[in-house]
């Protein structure tokens, strides 16, 4: 879906690194990027150092695991405009448990064009998870093996190499939403989650703003006719609602609080210097373009469990989009894009 100029100005890289993008927006509109560098970049970098968690990846030739080779700062700077893939994981965990990736979003970032392609994969999608003896839900990959296995699983499913990941605990979103005074959500009727096998809650319709708890329950709601696909679309609405509210609040004094929230709930294998450089690159341009799509398919029981079966034609279309978007020489105007009507 193509955003308006006002909305796109708030996006930055937030669809891929949501909390940093939200912070970056405020610096652009309230203090400018120069003031950001002067007053807050050191604090942000310190929190990013805390959040930097490279993952161990299998080395195909030796069969032994290894950490992805890091580029030197010079190599990274020279490669700053290269399109790359980012797997965004929204983690729903309670207490000290690892949790599952309730949001699985593949993003192609084109820094030179300040453009994003976002593909949401329903969490119950039936896939082959490396190391497991039978197919399972894509959300379970993170529970079994953390970000590394999630990256490997999604890459295998879409026949591509995932360059980077970013994971955000949903409790971090809740704290962000409360810090900015709630968000607007298009809830026309009460959402009642009361199935015996589900967490019980009610989200009242028609509220002017929804607090963090209600907003997360909006994302977690499971009992509508659209099932897992509807849930994935609500995740996109949820992210956009956070960014829309951020564009209105404009209170830069809240930024230190948001930086602290980011440090506690955010993890990525992108080095801190690269994150800051990418944020500045994406924020320094004019209007930005964000195109989104939710993988099509249907849900049904299989082997005693409920799965979402991806539509093969749509999955092939998504793979073709991603390959095209990763072509650094391609012009944005010539790239295939999702139909906005399909993402509404």
Explain the meaning of each model-derived region.
Residues 2-344:
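Non-catalytic, solvent-exposed segments at the cell envelope interface
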């Amino acid at each position: 879906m193509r955003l308006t100029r006002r909305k796109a100005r708030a996006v930055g890289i937030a669809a891929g690194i949501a909390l940093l993008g939200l912070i970056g927006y405020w610096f652009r509109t309230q203090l400018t990027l120069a003031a950001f560098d002067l007053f807050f970049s050191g604090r942000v970098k310190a929190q990013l150092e805390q959040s930097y968690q490279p993952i161990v990846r299998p080395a195909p030739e030796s069969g032994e695991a290894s950490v992805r080779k890091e580029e030197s700062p010079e190599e990274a700077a020279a490669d700053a405009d290269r399109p790359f893939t980012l797997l965004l994981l929204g983690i729903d965990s309670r207490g000290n448990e690892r949790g599952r990736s309730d949001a699985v979003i593949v993003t192609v970032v084109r820094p030179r064009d300040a453009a994003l392609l976002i593909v949401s994969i329903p969490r119950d999608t039936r896939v082959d998870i490396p190391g497991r003896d039978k197919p399972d839900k894509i959300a379970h990959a993170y529970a079994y093996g953390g970000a590394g296995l999630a990256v490997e699983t999604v890459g295998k499913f879409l026949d591509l190499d995932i360059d980077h990941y970013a994971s955000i605990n949903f409790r971090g979103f809740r704290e962000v939403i409360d810090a900015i005074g709630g968000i607007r959500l298009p809830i026309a009727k009460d959402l009642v989650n009361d199935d015996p096998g589900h967490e019980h809650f009610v989200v009242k319709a028609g509220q002017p703003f929804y607090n963090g708890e209600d907003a997360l329950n909006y994302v977690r709601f499971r009992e509508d006719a659209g099932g897992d696909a509807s849930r994935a679309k609500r995740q996109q609405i949820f992210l956009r609602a956070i960014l829309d509210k951020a564009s209105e609040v404009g209170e830069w004094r809240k930024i230190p609080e948001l930086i602290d929230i980011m440090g506690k709930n955010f993890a990525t294998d992108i080095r801190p210097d690269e994150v800051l450089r990418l944020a500045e690159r994406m924020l320094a341009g004019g209007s930005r373009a964000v195109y989104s799509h939710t993988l099509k398919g249907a849900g049904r029981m299989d082997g005693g469990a409920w799965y979402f079966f991806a539509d093969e034609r749509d999955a092939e279309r998504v793979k073709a989009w991603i390959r095209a978007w990763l072509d650094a020489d391609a012009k944005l105007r010539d790239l295939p894009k999702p139909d906005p009507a399909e993402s509404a």
